[in-house]
Amino acid sequence: MAAAALRSGWCRCPRRCLGSGIQFLSSHNLPHGSTYQMRRPGGELPLSKSYSSGNRKGFLSGLLDNVKQELAKNKEMKESIKKFRDEARRLEESDVLQEARRKYKTIESETVRTSEVLRKKLGELTGTVKESLHEVSKSDLGRKIKEGVEEAAKTAKQSAESVSKGGEKLGRTAAFRALSQGVESVKKEIDDSVLGQTGPYRRPQRLRKRTEFAGDKFKEEKVFEPNEEALGVVLHKDSKWYQQWKDFKENNVVFNRFFEMKMKYDESDNAFIRASRALTDKVTDLLGGLFSKTEMSEVLTEILRVDPAFDKDRFLKQCENDIIPNVLEAMISGELDILKDWCYEATYSQLAHPIQQAKALGLQFHSRILDIDNVDLAMGKMMEQGPVLIITFQAQLVMVVRNPKGEVVEGDPDKVLRMLYVWALCRDQDELNPYAAWRLLDISASSTEQIL
């Protein structure tokens, strides 16, 4: 192969040709490498030689280049650190910093010296005042002042004793006792009406039947005679304006859109919207039948025929504090006699059947109510039994049923259930007492496990 290169004058294998003593004259770049022109040592025949390197660096050459670059970087970093140290040294030795340190030390020493002087002056002043008071107490004027102070103290003590005795005498008088009782009654009413709204749920001390009274509060309530004249003003169907009003509500686009927005607002679960409903409920009451069906007006009118003092807010408060606790506690504890008194026959049979089966197996009810809230009036409806008001509310319960051995057979004592109830309460028109007139006509419930 070297002989062929010598004959042609060009070569692509420089190592072998160099071993033969051939010298290079020139080189040319070709697509697959480099070609070198060569001649013999005597110089009479030019030769060419090609070397294909592929323009690639070897592993060692690349490693050496990387080492050189790292050394250059380290050198630059060392120079930067050296410059930084030189600048820090110059700043440390600058006149401005030295002057600032001297001023700081001067201020600190002056502060310590001033504190010591003030402490000494205060001690001297205290000693002078003590000596002056001692000298004044020895003089006639000081003795008179001391005696006057002691006399004033005795007089004040005697006055306090007199006021205390007078207060005891006043407290024993009939007028003061009557005033105190009045104040306590007002305080109790305020606590019941205001604080009772936000307080935690408390189980009734005794579950009462519908026909019983829980205390003097119910006995003192005035029972009205039936009033045959309707006190509520309702637009009658025979009125010439009724058909126009009906057409307006059914065909007006703006009114229907507004009514749809009102329904979405009432059904929203947003916390902010739920908190603002207290104000809008008042507005709805003022607007009357604009957002309520005619059937609700008929139901309220029928109730007012028997109970002219009926009020929606007071009715909801009665449900929250009296009706719901008694009925719901009887349901979860298996008090069948209480349920039978509060419920209609069909509702009682529906609720009593599982309770009777559990008692037949010897099971015991250990459920409890944690809270009752969000009591609201959903709608009204006229039924054969009488006017019906449908209420909704939420309750937090812990449902537990145990066998005679104490083992839990149903429920979980560590799990809180949030129940959504829908109750239909019917007004017994034959019962004049409002606290014994409402009976449970129907019930519906759904439950979800409360995580927090």
UniProtKB/Swiss-Prot annotation:
Modified residues (Phosphothreonine): 128
Sequence positions bearing N6-succinyllysine: 217
One example of a Gene Ontology biological process annotation: protein import into mitochondrial matrix
Membrane topology: Peripheral membrane protein
Coiled coil: none
UniProt binding sites for ATP: 166-173
Superkingdom assignment: Eukaryota
A cellular-component GO term for this protein: mitochondrion
Database matches in SMART domains: Tim44
Residues annotated with Phosphoserine modification: 180
Chief site of localization: mitochondrion
Cell compartments where the protein resides: Mitochondrion inner membrane; Mitochondrion matrix
GO MF term set: ATP binding; protein-folding chaperone binding
Subunit details: Probable component of the PAM complex at least composed of a mitochondrial HSP70 protein, GRPEL1 or GRPEL2, TIMM44, TIMM16/PAM16 and TIMM14/DNAJC19. The complex interacts with the TIMM23 component of the TIM23 complex. Interacts with SLC25A4/ANT1 and SLC25A5/ANT2; leading to inhibit the presequence translocase TIMM23, thereby promoting stabilization of PINK1.
Task of the protein: Essential component of the PAM complex, a complex required for the translocation of transit peptide-containing proteins from the inner membrane into the mitochondrial matrix in an ATP-dependent manner. Recruits mitochondrial HSP70 to drive protein translocation into the matrix using ATP as an energy source.
Assigned protein family: Belongs to the Tim44 family.
NCBIfam families assigned: 3a0801s03tim44
Name under which the protein is recorded: Mitochondrial import inner membrane translocase subunit TIM44
Lineage, uppermost ranks: Eukaryota, Metazoa, Chordata, Craniata, Vertebrata
